[in-house]
Amino acid sequence: MTPAENKALRESMGLTLKWLATRWGVTVQSVKRWEGSRTPPPQIAKDMLDLKRKFDADVQRLVENGDEVVEVPRRDRDCTGSEQSAAWARAVAQRAKEQRGLTMEFRDAKGAEKQ
């Protein structure tokens, strides 16, 4: 996986540099290098491809089983246990929207004020 492919894949799934750095136990700077001038180590490239498979499975599940209106989290703290991050959930829903034409609305945490 080239640095450009690594970055494009991360962005397409709505993942942040910080989220990946935490997942891999490295610094944000290391993740930036793997998207800049250095090829990611094989285990990092494998994990990115594993995340992509999960992302695609989440999209397919939403396409096949989702409602016409899908609620997505506005912030990470509004996520359910199955979502990687709010941006991930929105990216999954957007991809499903492109395939099936569903509508997205924000889901806010219970008791939180709508913004």
Explain the meaning of each model-derived region.
Residues 1-12:
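A short, Lys/Arg-rich alpha-helix, primarily the initiator
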Residues 2, 44, 51-52, 82-85, ...:
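Intrinsic-disorder-associated interaction segments
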Residues 19-21:
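Short alpha-helical "recognition helix" segments of helix-turn-helix
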Residues 57-115:
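Helix-turn-helix/homeodomain-like alpha-helical modules used for DNA recognition
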Residues 6, 17, 28:
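Helix-turn-helix DNA-binding elements, focusing on the entry/boundary residues of the two helices
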Residues 17, 40-59:
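DNA major-groove recognition helix of helix-turn-helix/homeodomain DNA-binding modules
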Residues 25-40:
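Recognition helix of helix-turn-helix/homeodomain-like DNA-binding domains
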